[in-house]
């Protein structure tokens, strides 16, 4: 089955055929580093990291660009409100975004260009638009006229006579529907020299310029949040077409994280930060939660849903560790094999993570029944459990949540001292229990087990001794 993705521009599922054989090119609108990231921002990073992983698994060499918008009205306004240099403000929150991406195991992009590093290219791009008759300069501002482009509005379905660019009328606009490519300099704001006077770039121009610089005039996929479809992505297309570039061949948009049915946003005061949520669940569990819904669907946040997802992940993790233990006791290493056919079909159906996860859980459920026999050394059971474990690792690897992946081991190591301390205490209790069992002191053995259960610790007896884990409740 060929990968099919829902193209927002054509509003239909389309077979994904890369522009260049064996390669895939993806541009993701990254962060505007105006304030701390919340999980609404991070959902996009996780969703399209999974896309990237699947393209890579399919054997494609993926060029993945995720930009940083480090000059913007909101950045300037917030920096001014707090009496801080704009560049320092942007750098501070860029570091916070990077930390959050790292915590959630998001693979770094192939390149992460910054808007402020591409002003010469933006000036050149504007000149092409003006030369083609689609743009004009007035009093240091540069505008683009959507009315000059017959396909304007095709992505978002916006009607020209009803659209609102969400910006002020501007000095010298010929039509209120025209949008800004370049903003004339204002006192106290950063600015750069151009043939039309000093100023700074508009948001839309930044992305079109960087996407085409690194991926070419035409590339495969442009991705981003649903809220960016208009005006941002519509205007990116307009700029590219005005300059004569074909631009993105497929458009993918992820749904919002919502609370009480409303989009998570700072303006509504319903923001959940990554550090706060990591007080409730581990980073890998938060990633699992954010990636578990279909990328195009809305994800309604609740703490109960987050905890439920974390419990679901722990069931998968428990099996992988058990399979790894079985492999180790039989002088084998639990690697990664191939994903199942059902998993492949799910992922090829518009990156259908819910169906893909259902397949992972199915494999785990069917294999758990053979764990006891495998622990006893039954050769058929060992082979079955290890084979299933390697399949599960492969599938979870595509989703970015393989429990044995080094990145999760490194992140877990940050809090490893706490786990080691707990393990020492639990092992002391288990030693008491083991001694009592050897002496047939069942009352003491049961009392130890009950104490541990009351503390949320589940004990499992295996041929090689007792093992413990935290309860899923």
From Swiss-Prot:
<feature type="short sequence motif" description="'KMSKS' region">
    <location>
        <begin position="263"/>
        <end position="267"/>
    </location>
</feature>
<comment type="subunit">
    <text>Monomer.</text>
</comment>
<dbReference type="InterPro" id="IPR056411">
    <property type="entry name" value="CysS_C"/>
</dbReference>
<dbReference type="InterPro" id="IPR024909">
    <property type="entry name" value="Cys-tRNA/MSH_ligase"/>
</dbReference>
<protein>
    <recommendedName>
        <fullName>Cysteine--tRNA ligase</fullName>
        <ecNumber>6.1.1.16</ecNumber>
    </recommendedName>
</protein>
<dbReference type="Pfam" id="PF23493">
    <property type="entry name" value="CysS_C"/>
</dbReference>
<dbReference type="GO" id="GO:0005829">
    <property type="term" value="C:cytosol"/>
</dbReference>
<dbReference type="GO" id="GO:0008270">
    <property type="term" value="F:zinc ion binding"/>
</dbReference>
<dbReference type="InterPro" id="IPR014729">
    <property type="entry name" value="Rossmann-like_a/b/a_fold"/>
</dbReference>
<feature type="binding site">
    <location>
        <position position="29"/>
    </location>
    <ligand>
        <name>Zn(2+)</name>
    </ligand>
</feature>
<keyword id="KW-0963">Cytoplasm</keyword>
<dbReference type="GO" id="GO:0006423">
    <property type="term" value="P:cysteinyl-tRNA aminoacylation"/>
</dbReference>
<feature type="binding site">
    <location>
        <position position="232"/>
    </location>
    <ligand>
        <name>Zn(2+)</name>
    </ligand>
</feature>
<keyword id="KW-0648">Protein biosynthesis</keyword>
<keyword id="KW-0030">Aminoacyl-tRNA synthetase</keyword>
<dbReference type="Pfam" id="PF09190">
    <property type="entry name" value="DALR_2"/>
</dbReference>
<keyword id="KW-0436">Ligase</keyword>
<dbReference type="InterPro" id="IPR032678">
    <property type="entry name" value="tRNA-synt_1_cat_dom"/>
</dbReference>
<feature type="short sequence motif" description="'HIGH' region">
    <location>
        <begin position="31"/>
        <end position="41"/>
    </location>
</feature>
<feature type="binding site">
    <location>
        <position position="266"/>
    </location>
    <ligand>
        <name>ATP</name>
    </ligand>
</feature>
<keyword id="KW-0547">Nucleotide-binding</keyword>
<dbReference type="InterPro" id="IPR009080">
    <property type="entry name" value="tRNAsynth_Ia_anticodon-bd"/>
</dbReference>
<keyword id="KW-0862">Zinc</keyword>
<dbReference type="Pfam" id="PF01406">
    <property type="entry name" value="tRNA-synt_1e"/>
</dbReference>
<comment type="similarity">
    <text>Belongs to the class-I aminoacyl-tRNA synthetase family.</text>
</comment>
<keyword id="KW-0067">ATP-binding</keyword>
<feature type="binding site">
    <location>
        <position position="236"/>
    </location>
    <ligand>
        <name>Zn(2+)</name>
    </ligand>
</feature>
<dbReference type="GO" id="GO:0004817">
    <property type="term" value="F:cysteine-tRNA ligase activity"/>
</dbReference>
<dbReference type="GO" id="GO:0005524">
    <property type="term" value="F:ATP binding"/>
</dbReference>
<dbReference type="InterPro" id="IPR015803">
    <property type="entry name" value="Cys-tRNA-ligase"/>
</dbReference>
<dbReference type="InterPro" id="IPR015273">
    <property type="entry name" value="Cys-tRNA-synt_Ia_DALR"/>
</dbReference>
<keyword id="KW-0479">Metal-binding</keyword>
<feature type="binding site">
    <location>
        <position position="207"/>
    </location>
    <ligand>
        <name>Zn(2+)</name>
    </ligand>
</feature>
